[in-house]
Amino acid sequence: MLEHIKSDIESVKRRDPAARSTIEILLTYSGLHAVLMYRVSHWFYTKKLYTIARCISQIARLITGIEIHPGARIGKGFFIDHGSGVVIGETTEIGDYCLVYQGVTLGGTGKEKGKRHPTLGNNVMVGAGARVLGPFKVGDNAKIAANAVVLEEVPPNCTAVGVPARIVRRNGKRVAGDLDQIHIPDPVAQELCAHLIRIEKLEKQIKRLEIAEIGNRLNGGK
């Protein structure tokens, strides 16, 4: 547990340029506070002290606005940036050095027992407001765009965007436009553009037909 805590702190230092010192990180980063309290609650959970574990996780939720079930399994170097509104379910599994932004939900899609939450590989990034729902895997080095809704497996080294999410980048090769936390494709705007293109094509076809009709009338009048 101590090794994981040290790695969590180092991950904040490495990923956040605003982090200036270890003391500042320990005192002011609510995402780190939630992760540290999760580490403690998870230890109690593994000892089958479930009530104590859940009480600690609830205290963490009240303090930080981040809810991590103590039954979740999270690797080292986990960083929750900004943090508020993050929800991580009981059977979630998260690999090493993953990054999660505010408002993310790693949730289930049903009430059944057993595995019902996602598994994230190593070095996965999940953007702000994204929802990953179901017992499937998001592969190593994958990126989930802000506000995406992921309902099926994302292969390693891929980028997913949209509602429902689709792959836009695979193994370093662009499938569609690239994205980051700010510049991501807008599914509504893309659909609107597609409709405008179709309308423009129809207008051109109508114009050609009108010209042809005028020509036929002129020829018929001779």
Q: What is each PLM-predicted segment?
A:
Residues 61-168:
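Structural signal for interior beta-strand "rungs" in well-ordered beta-sheet cores
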